[in-house]
């Protein structure tokens, strides 16, 4: 009787062990799952605030500086992570832009074709004083079509030659840069150059000023 009991216990234990060997892999194997964590990043744009511009030299108030324009420049740095880039526009707060008071001023530059920049700066006529600007983007391809040149004319071609394509400042925004991709973290240094010339226009002594505003907007 005892032998039968021991045999039965042994058989049961063997069956249990065999069952464990069969089922153990299912118990020990791992199962896994994953999730995707998403964080949105919005587009932003910044523009620097450069110091005010002092032109390269004073202009004699009676004889003027015909044939020897005075020059100045400023650089606005634009940074954006916007995938489609930005546009930058320029405008003046007054007409004419460069003024001393209600009587004495520099006329806004007068290009040969209205609203189209002159490839070369046009000398001021007798008794005339003028103020104008041009733009030199950090990336030539970003130059607005109006300020691109083909080596002899503006609003044409794909170049942006230095010290070319001069235009009058306007109280209406004029697009000077059009970039279609984001910038680097360092941004794009956009140079705006200014010139003044007087051909014996009588100008009262003083510091004439023009307030020029640059606006950068995401595309």
Each model region followed by its residue ranges:
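C-terminal segment of classical bacterial N-terminal signal peptides
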Residues: 15-27
């Amino acid at each position: 009787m005892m032998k039968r009991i021991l045999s039965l216990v042994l058989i049961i234990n063997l069956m249990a062990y065999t069952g464990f060997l069969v089922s153990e892999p299912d118990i020990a194997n791992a199962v896994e799952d994953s999730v995707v964590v998403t964080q949105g990043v919005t587009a932003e744009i910044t523009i620097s605030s450069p110091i005010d511009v002092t032109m390269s030299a004073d202009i004699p108030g009676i004889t003027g500086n015909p044939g020897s324009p005075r020059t100045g420049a400023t650089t606005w740095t634009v940074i954006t992570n916007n995938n489609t880039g930005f546009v930058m526009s320029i405008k003046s707060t007054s007409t004419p832009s460069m003024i001393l008071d209600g009587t004495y001023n520099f006329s806004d530059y007068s290009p040969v074709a209205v609203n189209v920049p002159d490839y070369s700066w046009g000398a001021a006529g007798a008794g005339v004083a003028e103020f104008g600007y041009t733009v030199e983007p950090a990336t030539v391809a970003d130059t607005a079509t109006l300020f691109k040149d083909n080596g002899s004319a503006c609003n044409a071609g794909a170049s942006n030659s230095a010290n070319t394509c001069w235009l009058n400042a306007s109280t209406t925004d004029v697009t000077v840069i059009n970039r279609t991709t984001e910038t680097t973290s360092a941004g794009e240094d956009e140079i705006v150059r200014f010139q003044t010339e007087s051909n014996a226009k009588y100008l009262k002594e003083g510091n004439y000023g023009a307030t020029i505003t640059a606006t950068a907007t995401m595309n």
